């Protein structure tokens, strides 16, 4: 009995080393291919959901915010848009959905949507005079005004074009050319007036039948006025139609007309090309700076995805329709609960055989807990932890870099004749967004599964590293722990952790202790067998006496 008791006490006080992993108070949850809402020690949100609700400078360059003016009102020079007569370089253009100051004289702007698309590749215009207003000596250049375009309570007209009227009851045929001697392309605008009736035609232009011819090396245009009775818009029954072209360097534009001509006075020299956009937004300027702008506000984020608005300008995350994208960077967070029986202390283990993580180990993801006569403590395995951190960091950065390539996310505009094309374009863009969203969500699910498996594998590798060193000098307890068959002081424990454990040095002591424990087990088994036989014989004898007594009594 004394030998058995000593053996049990010896077992309780045996030195131990355990392999485990970090745990903390995190409540972060991620989804994987196999599971939802897995709690992890560390996670990284890769979906930006916030913006500042302002229009900002883009990389230090201010946007051109047209306020109540449209692009057409700005380019033609609506009198109510005088603040935009000369504008500095812009990063992007902001136009309201329904600006009040558009074409003050009712009409149409030909290929307007195409012009807006052109502006999405331009960052700066320089306005230059190409045909001075004072050069029209045979025509009335100052009488072409309208109450539809008021300025300071008086009739006015677009600032950048001239509405030519007959002079002294005559409208001589115009033949005027302009040669682009600049090194830059020129944006030139002109127009035609469509009167309400024949009386207005002769009143303004004298000639009942008129035309306008415009030609460049790439353009051959002939226009005739469309005289028709129309309902009034802005008090006008007439209409104006405006046109534009890009005149290349060393090319010339030629105008010929005998009436109804709205001549260019100013043109726009395209002095800087680059990525720009025309963004529809009602926001105000916020005196801020950003790398990514949306119609809802600026995004300042290094995340690879956002769900704020599909239209963006700048270095932006990719838009997806998801509400949540979280990457696991740490381990499954399963803190081990303290047990009632504390003979072994807090020991944990990995998926499959380790019961929980250690909150006491704070300086690494994987590591050890040891206990011996000198005490106990946690120690992180710095090498495996650092390799894991590098691997996860590289993976996250790789995902961000891979997903940073974005298709053009600036909306296109279509005229009324192109609605079917617009609908098709929207369906295609919606399809792209659906694909990107699916890819992003699938990528996150797969990477989270791989990350958690990666951590499990690292802990298992650390366990195997210890197991292969100790061999039969220690016993595997099945919960991530090893119980030594020999005394293992702190120096011995450190050698196990750093991989320099000397198996032969401790093998003899371990063998003797192992044999002693085996002997105690055998002796205990023999004692229990004797007691069992004795108990059986005694019980049988008592039963026989009782049966005999009963027989005599019955006789």
UniProtKB/Swiss-Prot annotation:
The keyword Transmembrane helix applies. Pfam families: Hemagglutinin (PF00509). A lipid is attached at residue 555 (S-palmitoyl cysteine). Its main location: virion. GO terms for cellular component: host cell plasma membrane; membrane; viral envelope; virion membrane. Gene3D superfamilies: 3.90.20.10, 3.90.209.20, Hemagglutinin Chain A, Domain 2. The keyword Transmembrane helix applies. Glycans are attached at residues 24-25, 37, 179, 300, 498. InterPro entries: Capsid_hemagglutn (IPR008980), Hemagglutn_HA1_a/b_dom_sf (IPR013828), Hemagglutn_influenz_A (IPR000149), Hemagglutn_influenz_A/B (IPR001364). One of its GO terms (molecular function) is host cell surface receptor binding. Residues 551-555 are cytoplasmic. This is Hemagglutinin. The lineage of its organism: Viruses, Riboviria, Orthornavirae, Negarnaviricota, Polyploviricotina. The gene is HA.
């Amino acid at each position: 009995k004394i030998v058995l008791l000593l053996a049990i006490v010896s077992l309780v006080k045996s030195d131990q080393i355990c392999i485990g992993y970090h745990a903390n108070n995190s409540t972060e949850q991620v989804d994987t291919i196999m599971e939802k809402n897995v709690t992890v020690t560390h996670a990284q949100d890769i979906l930006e959901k916030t913006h500042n609700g302002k229009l900002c400078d883009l990389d230090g360059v201010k946007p051109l915010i047209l306020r109540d003016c449209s692009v057409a009102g700005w380019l033609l020079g609506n009198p109510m848009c005088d603040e935009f007569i000369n504008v500095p370089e812009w990063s992007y253009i902001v136009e309201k959905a329904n600006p009040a100051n558009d074409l003050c004289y009712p009409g149409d702007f030909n290929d307007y949507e195409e012009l807006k698309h052109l502006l999405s590749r331009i960052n700066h215009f320089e306005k230059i005079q190409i045909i001075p207003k004072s050069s029209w000596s045979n025509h009335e250049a100052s009488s072409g005004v309208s109450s539809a375009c008021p300025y300071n309570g008086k009739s006015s007209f677009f600032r950048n074009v001239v509405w030519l009227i007959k002079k002294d009851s005559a409208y001589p045929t115009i033949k005027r050319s302009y040669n682009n001697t600049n090194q830059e392309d020129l944006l030139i605008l002109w127009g035609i007036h469509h009167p309400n009736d024949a009386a207005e035609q002769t009143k303004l232009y004298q000639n009942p039948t008129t035309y306008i011819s415009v030609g460049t090396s790439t353009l051959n245009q002939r226009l005739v006025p469309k005289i028709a009775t129309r309902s009034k818009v802005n008090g006008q029954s007439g209409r104006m139609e405006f046109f534009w072209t890009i005149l290349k360097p060393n090319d010339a534009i030629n105008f010929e007309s005998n009436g109804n001509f709205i001549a260019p006075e100013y043109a726009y020299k395209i002095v800087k090309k680059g990525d720009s956009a025309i963004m529809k937004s009602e926001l105000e300027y916020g005196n801020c700076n950003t790398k990514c702008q949306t119609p809802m506000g600026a995004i300042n984020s290094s995340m690879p995805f956002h769900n704020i608005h599909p239209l963006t300008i700048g270095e932006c995350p990719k838009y997806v329709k998801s509400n949540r994208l979280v990457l696991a960077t740490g381990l499954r967070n399963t803190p081990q609960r303290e047990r009632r029986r504390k003979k072994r202390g807090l020991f944990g283990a990995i998926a499959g055989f380790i019961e929980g993580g250690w909150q006491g180990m704070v300086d690494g993801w994987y590591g050890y807990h040891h206990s011996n006569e000198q005490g106990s403590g946690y120690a992180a395995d710095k090498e495996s932890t650092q390799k894991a951190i590098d691997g996860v960091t590289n993976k996250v950065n790789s995902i961000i870099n891979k997903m940073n390539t974005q298709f053009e996310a600036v909306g296109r505009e279509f005229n009324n004749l192109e609605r079917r094309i617009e609908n098709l374009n929207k369906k295609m863009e919606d399809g792209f967004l659906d694909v990107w969203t699916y890819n992003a969500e699938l990528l996150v699910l797969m990477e989270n599964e791989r990350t958690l498996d990666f951590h499990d594998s690292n802990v298992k590798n650390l366990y195997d590293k210890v197991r292969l060193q100790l061999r039969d000098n220690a016993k595997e307890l099945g919960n991530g722990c090893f119980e030594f068959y020999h005394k293992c002081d702190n120096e011995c424990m450190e050698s196990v952790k750093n991989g320099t454990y000397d198996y032969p040095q401790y093998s003899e002591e371990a063998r003797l202790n192992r044999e002693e424990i085996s002997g105690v087990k055998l002796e205990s088994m023999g004692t229990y067998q004797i007691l069992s036989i004795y108990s059986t014989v005694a019980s049988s004898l008592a039963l026989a006496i009782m049966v005999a007594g009963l027989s005599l009594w019955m006789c």
